[in-house]
């Protein structure tokens, strides 16, 4: 096999591996994971003996259940008078006062991808029971369309506006991530086809075009992965922090799906570099050979 054909075959193999890894990353849901077990253990140690005896054997104490008997929303008054609009007032109005403490939020182990966010089963019996009884869904779809949130009474308008704007910016980041990954797959597939054609027709030209397509795929992947990292950071830093941020002892980070995407990026950049660099290397060798022959003559 000629050296040029060998380089084309190697770059085609790398591009096919990259395509497989990229498709695997897109259609799996393990891009980002959270594990609050260490956080719950520390909360249980700090809360030991604080719960009444009739709640110690419950899966979830009454104070942490999402549904509690409370007066209708219209009958509840803001603490401190009707004109008060500080965060403490609307938090207590919505029953969110217990979220101020780090142990007041019901946190569960989750994993998420581009399309869904799911709960891990077998880690927390609270969420396992809720899912088995049909009270909670194991997986929920990640939104790629903007839906107007419900306007709750007695919540400061500035806070509502901030939440809506953050949701809109996060939606744009998600769309950029998914859109550029889709374009990366399409361009990579075209590059594989062109690299295959190079075995039969205009090897030099088609190899160069395939290399350009591979490098373009790498650019799209880089934009998409950086945008995804930005969306995760943006989501964790949204306000109000008591709802969107995570306690410091909750383990969270990227998982194997996004590492598949990064490996795909590495393979495709290597394939594009081979296709682009080989013609220049071969020309340099030919020039050296010609100069050597001329010197001997």
From Swiss-Prot:
It is found in: Endoplasmic reticulum membrane. Glycans are attached at residue 158. GO terms for biological process: negative regulation of osteoclast differentiation; regulation of cytosolic calcium ion concentration. Residues 41-57 have a biased composition (Basic and acidic residues). InterPro entries: PMP22/EMP/MP20/Claudin (IPR004031), T178A/B (IPR039625). Highly expressed in the bone and its expression increases during osteoclastogenesis. It comes from the Eukaryota. Keywords: Endoplasmic reticulum, Glycoprotein, Membrane, Signal, Transmembrane, Transmembrane helix. Residues 41-86 are annotated as: Disordered. One of its GO terms (cellular component) is endoplasmic reticulum membrane. Residues 68-79 have a biased composition (Low complexity). Disruption phenotype: Mice are osteopenic and are more susceptible to inflammatory bone loss, owing to enhanced osteoclast formation. The keyword Glycoprotein applies. It is a multi-pass membrane protein. Residues 201-208, 279-297 are cytoplasmic. Interacts with STIM1. Acts as a negative regulator of osteoclast differentiation in basal and inflammatory conditions by regulating TNFSF11-induced Ca (2+) fluxes, thereby controlling the induction of NFATC1. Belongs to the TMEM178 family. This is Transmembrane protein 178A. The gene is Tmem178a.
């Amino acid at each position: 096999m000629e050296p040029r054909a060998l380089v084309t075959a190697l770059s085609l193999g790398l591009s096919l591996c990259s395509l497989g890894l990229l498709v695997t990353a897109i259609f799996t849901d393990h891009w980002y994971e959270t594990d609050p077990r260490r956080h719950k253990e520390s909360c249980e140690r700090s809360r030991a003996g604080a719960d009444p005896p009739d709640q110690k054997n419950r899966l979830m104490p009454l104070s942490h259940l999402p549904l509690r008997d409370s007066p209708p929303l219209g009958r509840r008054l803001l603490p401190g008078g009707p004109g008060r609009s500080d965060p403490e007032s609307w938090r207590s109005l919505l029953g969110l006062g217990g979220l101020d403490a780090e142990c007041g939020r019901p946190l569960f182990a989750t994993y998420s991808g581009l399309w869904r966010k799911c709960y891990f089963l077998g880690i927390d019996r609270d969420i396992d029971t809720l899912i088995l009884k049909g009270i909670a869904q194991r997986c929920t779809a990640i939104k790629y369309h903007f839906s107007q949130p419900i306007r709750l009474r007695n919540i400061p308008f500035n806070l509502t506006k901030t939440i809506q704007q953050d949701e809109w910016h996060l939606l744009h980041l998600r769309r950029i991530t998914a859109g550029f990954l889709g374009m990366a797959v399409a361009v990579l597939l075209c590059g594989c086809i062109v690299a295959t054609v190079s075995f039969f027709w205009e090897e030099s030209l088609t190899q160069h075009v395939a290399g350009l397509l591979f490098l373009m795929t790498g650019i799209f992947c880089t934009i998409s992965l950086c945008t995804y990292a930005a969306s995760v950071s943006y989501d964790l830093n949204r306000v109000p922090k008591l709802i969107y941020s995570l306690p410091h002892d909750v383990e969270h980070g990227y998982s194997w799906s996004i590492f598949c995407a990064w490996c795909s990026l590495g393979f495709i950049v290597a394939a594009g570099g081979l296709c682009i660099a080989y013609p220049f290397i071969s020309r340099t060798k030919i020039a050296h050979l010609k100069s050597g022959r001329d010197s001997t003559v």
